[in-house]
């Protein structure tokens, strides 16, 4: 399965550097010089020549793409990797597509809804769960609230605080 790890942005300077919108949690490893990335739409594989951070933006150059005009042709190209080619040594890490559609249940097995998405954030990741009542609920992806993820069995076990999924007495209805 392909996973988008970045989107090529606008050129930076005249020597083939390009800004990159990062969509991976490990950009320093993913975009290390020598890394080969596939493209969507297909413009052939790109090999990272250099990578550096400038004011919080990742700047890359690719082998064989050496000037501003050539880089401009890559604008909005998605950089993808094939997850099947990668070994995942971390049993405690998931890609959003692995969690989307999983059943969200309590520690006692009571259905709470379905995982819609995984948002990556500064402090912690957040699960977006569509509750059984149709509301979207944001659940911080931390062990006390999400004690177990079982992708093979198709479920995420949650231990939500009172009121997160169930209306509390006296709460106004939306």
From Swiss-Prot:
Compartments in which it is found: Cytoplasm
GO terms of molecular function: ribosome binding
The organism's place on the tree of life at top rank: Bacteria
One GO term (biological process): rRNA processing
Annotated Pfam families: PRC_RimM, RimM
Statement: the UniProt record of this protein carries the keyword Transmembrane helix: no
InterPro entries, per the entry: PRC_barrel-like_sf, PRC_RimM, RimM, RimM_N, RimM_N_sf, Transl_B-barrel_sf
Domain PRC barrel span(s) in chain numbering: 91-164
Assigned GO CC terms: cytoplasm; ribosome
Keywords for this protein: Chaperone, Cytoplasm, Ribosome biogenesis, rRNA processing
SUPFAM superfamilies assigned: PRC-barrel domain, Translation proteins
Oligomer status and interactors: Binds ribosomal protein uS19.
Task performed by this protein: An accessory protein needed during the final step in the assembly of 30S ribosomal subunit, possibly for assembly of the head region. Essential for efficient processing of 16S rRNA. May be needed both before and after RbfA during the maturation of 16S rRNA. It has affinity for free ribosomal 30S subunits but not for 70S ribosomes.
Similarity section: Belongs to the RimM family.
NCBIfam families listed in its UniProt record: 16S_RimM (TIGR02273)
Written domain comment of the UniProt record: The PRC barrel domain binds ribosomal protein uS19.
Protein name: Ribosome maturation factor RimM
Protein species of origin: Kineococcus radiotolerans (strain ATCC BAA-149 / DSM 14245 / SRS30216)
Lineage per the UniProt record: Bacteria, Bacillati, Actinomycetota, Actinomycetes, Kineosporiales
């Amino acid at each position: 399965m392909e996973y988008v790890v970045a989107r090529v942005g606008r050129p930076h300077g005249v020597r083939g550097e390009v800004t990159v919108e990062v969509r991976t949690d490990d950009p320093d490893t993913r975009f290390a010089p020598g890394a080969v990335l596939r493209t969507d739409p297909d413009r052939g594989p790109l090999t990272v020549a250099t990578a550096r951070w400038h004011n919080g933006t990742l700047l890359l150059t690719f082998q064989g793409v050496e000037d501003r005009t050539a880089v401009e042709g890559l604008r909005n190209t998605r950089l993808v990797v094939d997850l099947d080619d990668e070994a995942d040594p971390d049993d405690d890490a998931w890609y959003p597509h692995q969690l989307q559609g999983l059943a969200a249940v309590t520690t006692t097995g009571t259905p709470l809804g379905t995982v819609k998405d995984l948002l990556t954030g500064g402090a912690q990741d957040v699960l977006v769960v569509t509750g059984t009542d149709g509301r979207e609920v944001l659940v911080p992806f931390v062990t006390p609230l999400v004690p177990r993820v079982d992708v093979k069995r198709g479920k995420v076990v949650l231990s939500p605080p009172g009121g997160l999924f169930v209306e509390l007495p006296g709460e106004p209805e939306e």
